[in-house]
């Protein structure tokens, strides 16, 4: 306190200094809090990126192996599809059961390792991201653009397409369920009442 300052002025001066110091501390706390939040966000982004890279590396590592196994899966599928299920021979029946069990176990192993089968149902809409059209046929059972038949199942690995499903697609103009209705014929403006053919003109003056 100087000779000119009163005790009240001295107290006010000290209070002003304290107020400024408090404001400075508040700004520092806010800055530290913002920095901590940014560090936390960066850590979370780093964690997610590491997980994504790990999944990508895992998918890449087994992709070639999975693709090599698809041939075996296709052969098993064809074998079960062509098996004589009405055979009375116990040996043939047991053989068919064995092939079906092997195919089921292989598909189970695929699914456990992230390899998902793409086998669209009849009538399902063609998806260019998952399907490959190898032929088009007119159909009265499936609307145009729908899957008529799966010629070879496709597969995707952890969201990545390994092989598209080879399918036959209903051609344009197919009249299956869901096909757009034919537009109604426009009325003939020259038709007489009750008829749809052109009426006669009055040629009298």
Swiss-Prot record:
In Pfam terms, one family for this protein is GrpE
Keyword vocabulary terms for this entry? Chaperone, Cytoplasm, Stress response
Source organism per entry reads: Caulobacter sp. (strain K31)
Q: Report the principal subcellular site.
A: cytoplasm
Q: Name one GO cellular component term.
A: cytoplasm
Residues of the region (Disordered) are 172-205
Where it sits in the cell: the answer is: Cytoplasm
Name the NCBIfam families on file: PRK14140.1, PRK14155.1
For bias kind Low complexity, which ranges apply? 177-195
Q: What gene name does this entry carry?
A: grpE
Please name the CDD domains in this protein's record.
GrpE
Q: Which GO terms describe its molecular function?
A: adenyl-nucleotide exchange factor activity; protein homodimerization activity; protein-folding chaperone binding; unfolded protein binding
What does the protein in this record do?
A: Participates actively in the response to hyperosmotic and heat shock by preventing the aggregation of stress-denatured proteins, in association with DnaK and GrpE. It is the nucleotide exchange factor for DnaK and may function as a thermosensor. Unfolded proteins bind initially to DnaJ; upon interaction with the DnaJ-bound protein, DnaK hydrolyzes its bound ATP, resulting in the formation of a stable complex. GrpE releases ADP from DnaK; ATP binding to DnaK triggers the release of the substrate protein, thus completing the reaction cycle.
Q: Which family does it belong to?
A: Belongs to the GrpE family.
Describe its assembly.
Answer: Homodimer.
Protein name, UniProt field: Protein GrpE
One GO biological process term: protein folding
């Amino acid at each position: 306190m100087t000779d000119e300052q009163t005790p009240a002025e001295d107290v006010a001066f000290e209070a002003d200094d304290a107020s400024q110091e408090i404001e400075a501390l508040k700004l520092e706390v806010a800055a530290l809090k913002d920095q901590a939040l940014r560090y936390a966000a960066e850590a979370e982004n780093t964690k997610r990126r590491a997980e994504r890279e790990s999944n990508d590396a895992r998918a890449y590592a087994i992709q070639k192996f999975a693709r090599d196994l698809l041939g075996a899966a296709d052969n098993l599928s064809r074998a079960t599809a062509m098996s004589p299920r009405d055979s009375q021979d116990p040996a043939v029946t047991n053989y068919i059961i064995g092939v079906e069990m092997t195919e089921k176990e292989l598909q189970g192993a695929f699914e456990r390792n992230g390899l998902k089968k793409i086998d669209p149902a009849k009538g399902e809409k063609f998806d260019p991201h998952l399907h490959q059209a190898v032929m088009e046929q007119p159909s009265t059972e499936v609307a145009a653009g729908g899957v008529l038949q799966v010629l070879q199942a496709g597969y995707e690995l952890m969201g990545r397409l390994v092989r598209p499903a080879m399918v036959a697609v209903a051609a344009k103009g197919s009249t299956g369920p869901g096909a757009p209705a034919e537009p109604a014929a426009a009325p003939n403006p020259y038709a007489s009442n009750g008829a749809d053919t052109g009426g006669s003109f009055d040629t009298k003056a």
